[in-house]
């Protein structure tokens, strides 16, 4: 599901290129 707004939302996703999920993955990785 790469390339969509919400791509990479799952916690096990290798692809975090969706705009929303870029922010989410960045947030998650600060833990």
UniProtKB/Swiss-Prot annotation:
Pfam families: Toxin_12. GO terms for cellular component: extracellular region. InterPro entries: Huwentoxin-1 (IPR011696). Expressed by the venom gland. It is found in: Secreted. Disulfide bonds join 2-16, 9-21, 15-25. Its main location: secreted. The modification Tryptophan amide is found at residue 31. Keywords: Amidation, Calcium channel impairing toxin, Disulfide bond, Ion channel impairing toxin, Knottin, Neurotoxin, Potassium channel impairing toxin, Secreted, Toxin, Voltage-gated potassium channel impairing toxin. Blocks transient outward voltage-gated potassium channels in rat ventricular myocytes (thus prolonging action-potential duration) and rat Kv4.2/KCNA4 channels expressed in Xenopus oocytes. Is also a weak blocker of calcium channels in rat cerebellar granule cells. This is Kappa-sparatoxin-Hv1c. It comes from Heteropoda venatoria (Brown huntsman spider).
